[in-house]
């Protein structure tokens, strides 16, 4: 997994300092990973903003409650299987993603059957990206 081939596109700003601290901790460990924050609004405006931000060479990975739930090891294996494909992990706002955006997904991913605030979902995702990299590199960070 190459962090420079991944972006996180998220609606809204992180307002809680402890969440921002966690995100920054993992960002430093994943050099090259980009996080794009888009203004929160209504779902249609958010969807348009996300569509405009997605690049043609990226596969959108939509984070959603109805997405595929994976173990950390399975997540790392999936990332490895995608090779050098550019990925854009998309985290919607409070009202989630529109049906139109969900239809654009190359992969629908759920972090859990539970619902999380988008700020916390961002922290969980970046930690799982770091964990996936650690698993693929054989690092002791992941202890199953």
Swiss-Prot record:
GO cellular component terms, alphabetically, are:
cytoplasm
Q: Does the keyword Methyltransferase apply?
A: yes
Give the reaction(s) catalysed. pseudouridine(1915) in 23S rRNA + S-adenosyl-L-methionine = N(3)-methylpseudouridine(1915) in 23S rRNA + S-adenosyl-L-homocysteine + H(+)
**Keywords carried by this UniProt record:** Cytoplasm, Methyltransferase, rRNA processing, S-adenosyl-L-methionine, Transferase
> Which residues of the sequence carry a binding annotation for S-adenosyl-L-methionine?
92, 111-116
Where is this protein localized, as stated in its record?
Answer: Cytoplasm
GO terms assigned for molecular function: rRNA (pseudouridine-N3-)-methyltransferase activity
Has the keyword Transferase been applied to this entry? yes
The annotated subunit structure for this chain is: Homodimer.
Its name, as the record gives it, is Ribosomal RNA large subunit methyltransferase H
Organism whose genome encodes this protein: Synechococcus sp. (strain CC9311)
Q: Which gene encodes it?
A: rlmH
């Amino acid at each position: 997994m190459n962090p420079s081939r991944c972006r996180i596109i998220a609606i809204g700003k992180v307002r809680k300092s402890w969440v921002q601290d966690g995100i920054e901790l993992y960002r430093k460990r994943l050099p090259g990973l980009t996080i794009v924050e888009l203004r929160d609004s209504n779902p249609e405006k958010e969807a348009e903003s996300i569509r405009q931000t997605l690049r043609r060479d990226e596969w959108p990975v939509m984070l959603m409650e109805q997405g595929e739930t994976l173990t950390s090891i399975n997540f790392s294996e999936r990332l490895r299987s995608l090779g050098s494909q550019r990925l854009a992990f998309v985290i919607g706002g409070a009202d989630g993603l529109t049906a139109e955006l969900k239809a654009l997904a190359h992969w629908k991913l759920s972090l859990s059957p539970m619902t999380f605030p988008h700020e916390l979902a961002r922290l969980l995702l970046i930690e799982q990206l770091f964990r996936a990299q650690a698993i693929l590199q054989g690092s002791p960070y992941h202890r199953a």
